[in-house]
Amino acid sequence: MEYTVYKERLKQLKCAVIIPTYNNEKTIKKVVDSVKDYCDDVIVVNDGSTDHTSVILGEYSGIQYISYKENKGKGYALLTGLRYATEKGFDYAITLDSDGQHFADDIPTFIDRIEKSLEAF
């Protein structure tokens, strides 16, 4: 699969992928690796994990990693990621859970939807 085209489309849209996580040591590596295939602008928010999630995420370069010690809930993690994305100049964000329920393979569909919504204006 040619991922470069998706990376370029996301860059043109100024779109990042935000991954909130909490105690997902068994799935976080697979999720981040698959998202990085599609997108260079990955923001991971570690919501106070008490397992080895932070160790795994610490091994990555090329992701934006935000972490706090106390679990504050998924909503707070999403808001943190969205605020960060806005501060960094992104106009759009795609959120994917880190437990493996959502798949990076869905990113092209999200890109299509964003581009289609732009055509309405």
Model-derived segments and their meaning:
Residues 108-121:
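Conserved donor NDP-sugar-binding/catalytic core segment of glycosyltransferases
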Residues 54-88:
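Conserved donor nucleotide-binding strand/loop of the catalytic core
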Residues 90-101:
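Short beta-strand-to-loop acidic/aromatic patch adjacent to the donor-nucleotide binding site
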Residues 1-34:
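N-proximal low-complexity "stem/linker" segments adjacent to membrane-targeting elements
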Residues 32, 40-49, 66, 96:
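Short beta-strand/loop segment that forms part of the nucleotide-sugar
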Residues 27, 102-110:
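Substrate-positioning beta->alpha
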Residues 16-20, 43, 67:
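Short hydrophobic beta-strand elements that form part
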Residues 46-55, 100:
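A conserved acidic beta->alpha catalytic loop
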